[in-house]
Amino acid sequence: MEALEVDDISPALEVTEEFFSTLDSNLEKAVQQAEVYGIQEVPELVGHEVLSNITDNGAMRNVTSLGKGGMIWDHCKSRLLETKAQNVFPAKEQFMVQRGTTPDNLSWMEQKEASTFNFFNICQRRRDRPRSVNDLLDETSTFKPGHARSRSDITQVDWRVVLKTTPLQQQQQQQPLLQGPHVTRPSFLLPSPNKIEDAQGNTEHKQTFPNILKKGYLEIRKDHDSYWQSCYAELSPYNLYFYSLDSSGNQNLYATYQLSHFQSISVLGNLEARMVDTVLYDNTQLQLKAESPWEALDWGQKLWEVVHAAVPGYMGRQNELTISPGLGHHDDYTQNHSFQKKTSGLLPPSPVLDSSKQYQNILKSGTLYRLTVQNNWKAFTFVLSRAYLMAFQPGKLDEDPLLSYNVDVCLAVQMDNLDGCDSCFQVIFPQDVLRLRAETRQRAQEWMEALKIAANVARSSEQNLQVTLRNKPKDQMGGHELRKNKRQSVTTSFLSILTTLSLERGLTAQSFKCAGCQRSIGLSNGKAKVCNYSGWYYCSSCHVDDSFLIPARIVHNWDTSKYKVSKQAKEFLEYVYEEPLIDIQQENAMLYHHAEPLAAVLRLRQRLKSLRAYLFSCRAAVAEDLRRRIFPREYLLQQIHLYSLADLQQVIEGKLAPFLGKVIKFATSHVYSCSLCSQKGFICEICNNGEILYPFEDISTSRCESCGAVFHSECKEKSVPCPRCVRRELQKKQKSFWQRLNMDESLEEACTMFELSYQNT
């Protein structure tokens, strides 16, 4: 090997000597200095003697962590002495403050020369030394701040603004309850001058991410029963974004939470482990967990500050920062940093949706209880927008709404004191009367006011629209849209009670008004006619005694009679007459045992489903011929328990069974005559007589429900276990099982070792 030249060795020797000389001097300074800005940092090389001296001098009052707890090497991976110096040197000017306070930045800027060992200068001088001629051309400017920051905190702080602000605890002690339109924003949301000199005298530094206040890797979960999920989080002045990470490390937007949705923010745990627990507007939880307890505390405090400043419309709120210590000793006690917002006002948060563009113009949302047709209260999440009042299942806002009403056709909003409850109210629509109940009377009043305001705004917008369109007559302008929206609302309401027996709730529930045209009915105003489908009352114009089959009566009672329904109900039933919306197995499976015509149709559909597997695996022309014969009711081939109202009427009249019999006859003749389909039969594995069996021969054959094997009905009735299921269970046995099995013993002792999970049929 060629010897190294002196020029190749001298830079390394120079850096090494400079490094250790600076190390010795700064270690001496660190030991001599008893207190740095009121917070003491103890290097690990000093030993227990220095630690005991500092403790005796009372300098440990503000110590929050030692050793690796005061390092930033885990986040600032320096290329120089990364492994050796990690446990030796304290972090560069890392200020360790009490939770809930801000660091003394002025002292840090003025006494920069007296800080602890600054290893970044060495790294910078080593990096500034040119390595080659090309490096001289690519050499950049001097070191800029931000390189040694935590990878989850990228906030560029305007230090002049921060130095003028008061600490967080002082602000909470001095600032009274917010009144009026003025809201104090935190320092990171205040505008800064054009050129501000930072802590290192650099005036050319610009914010890399001006709209992102904090970002990093977190673990989130919805509640205590769910699993933690790793994600990448970004905190902006008005939203909290979560990105999912795939196997390649790519980030995809997972969910977006508006900061106005947060009702309370708490930091739970102790010094070793902490997590941020938040409660949203609909009482759902969102928990965040960071890499370290201090990172979790920083996330919680910064999230609270941004939530406090993001929505200036919440004027009647009281913001609190409480620290409630739990049981424990000294520094190991559990602390709960709670940042809460107590709301009192009409401005509500909108629902938490994965896509912020899914619903626009949300006015109010929350949990209300609706009186169902079974006369019980059921909780729903109601969302009020400028156009609709929607009801969702609790915690499932990403799904389609269960109920939807047009706000512009709302007739009245009034209190409901029939049950003696002061938090009940009614929302009257042309097609339905909603009886709702809130948690408190004040919450009910807020909902009533919001509904009235939304209805008035919707009506005024329609009037303004008519003026802008050259004053068209009301019957010509928007009449089609109004009828379309009304029909959609009626369809949604009637569809939810398709298989529910109707109950008459009385005229008082409708305020003695017709459910169709809102004309006064009852007493001297006219006769009220009840609709046997919905249970609502109508006038003589909206109810002309039309008769129709009631799906709920057929499903639950096998009542095949026709009953009088209103015009709206008849229109709806005719609209869904041929739609497969009724699942007998799900609604009332015992109906097959009580209705023989329906049981006969079930057996035919089971045979047809078995034949479908044969014909659809044959030539394409054969499958197309089967589709043509069954069109447009292909669900009869696949889902044997699904029926439409027309199918049920054909079952009652005895027309569906002959229709299915013709299709089965065509399919059976094809299987017996086709050279491909006829070879797909079964052999009875119990008797093994060689006869070819087919599963659609339901009279002479029986099929195993577990594996699908086909046997003779006489063989299966002998209570012999399925041979195929036995083989599959034995194949799952491990090798040690067969080694322990001694076939030389008696047969009974050997058979006791077999524990099979199949059903003994």
From Swiss-Prot:
Q: Which residues carry this modification: Phosphoserine?
A: 132
Q: Which organism is it from?
A: Homo sapiens (Human)
CDD domains, alphabetized: PH_PLEKHM3_1, PH_PLEKHM3_2
Query: Keyword Zinc-finger, does the record have it?
Result: yes
Q: Which domain of life is it from?
A: Eukaryota
UniProt KW Zinc-finger keyword: yes
Listed under subunit, the entry gives: Interacts with AKT1.
Q: Which InterPro entries match?
A: DEF8 (IPR051366), PH-like_dom_sf (IPR011993), PH_domain (IPR001849), PLEKHM3_PH_1 (IPR037812), RH_dom (IPR025258)
Alphabetically sorted, this entry's keywords are: Cell membrane, Cytoplasm, Golgi apparatus, Membrane, Metal-binding, Phosphoprotein, Repeat, Zinc, Zinc-finger
Q: What protein am I looking at?
A: Pleckstrin homology domain-containing family M member 3
GO cellular component term of the entry, any? Golgi apparatus
> Which PANTHER family has this protein been placed in?
PLECKSTRIN HOMOLOGY DOMAIN CONTAINING PROTEIN, PLECKSTRIN HOMOLOGY DOMAIN-CONTAINING FAMILY M MEMBER 3
Q: Which GO terms describe its biological process?
A: myoblast differentiation
Q: Known SUPFAM superfamilies for this protein?
A: PH domain-like
Q: Which GO terms describe its molecular function?
A: zinc ion binding
